[in-house]
């Protein structure tokens, strides 16, 4: 009788664990082609001229954006004098970072939802993407804070990212993937684990920018990774209900969009931008160590998964 009871308890425990694992959605890691991934290569100055008015129009239509921006603007005015910032870094760039890092509201989540699906077409972006100015200012902030050259200029940053509600899994080792959104990470593994363990990422990023000095929560020691950075999947394992993923940056970005607000259409392939040349596109195929590349046109690449 005791043995039967014990087996019953173990059976129930196993079912409970299985239910918990299955209750967390599983999403494949990929190049997320529907991401709005504009890096504004060659048009950042023109976008700076237009983004101010665009921001006012978008704030008029989105109350949370207006409230968040105004609060961050006030905080920026009080703290700006304490910061050492790179040339070209404007107040709007700093305010955009503060808006994003303020997790006391849902704006960062709404922005990333829009980013992950807003790149299906330029028409969809123009008509329905509600954060065009915020996306531009945040993208430029990361570019200016990180500087040009990626890992060609300085060593990549080893960071950690915890996700609480989703299991991300690669199809296989050697895949080329992007995170497909603005992805928060930390140089402190303990901090990252506080944000979740359904998926835990170990990353080496070449284009993620340290934003601790600008963050609403500086103790998180955050590094913010842009949607368009390309990574190699170098490791994957599962420990109970946890997926553990290791990603290594290619020191490369790729985008389907460039200067979309100014008329740039979505391109068939993901166009790579070589580190160190942020205002021009590479005309060569990416030297992917474990994947395949299909050359489409000068500067255009279709990154495909590794394997036969």
Swiss-Prot record:
Enzymatic class: transferase
Q: What keywords were assigned to this record? A: Disulfide bond, Glycoprotein, Glycosyltransferase, Membrane, NAD, NADP, Nucleotidyltransferase, Secreted, Signal, Transferase
TR mART core domain span: 63-253
Q: What is this protein called?
A: Ecto-ADP-ribosyltransferase 5
According to UniProt, the reaction catalysed is: L-arginyl-[protein] + NAD(+) = N(omega)-(ADP-D-ribosyl)-L-arginyl-[protein] + nicotinamide + H(+)
Which residues are responsible for catalysis? 161, 184, 222
Organism in which the protein naturally occurs: Rattus norvegicus
- Keyword Glycoprotein tagged: yes
**Which residues hold NAD(+)?**
100, 161, 181, 215
Per the database entry, which stretches of residues form a coiled coil?
none
Mention any one GO cellular component term assigned to this protein in its UniProt record.
membrane
Q: Which InterPro entries match?
A: ADP-ribosyltransferase_ARG, ART
Q: Which gene encodes it?
A: Art5
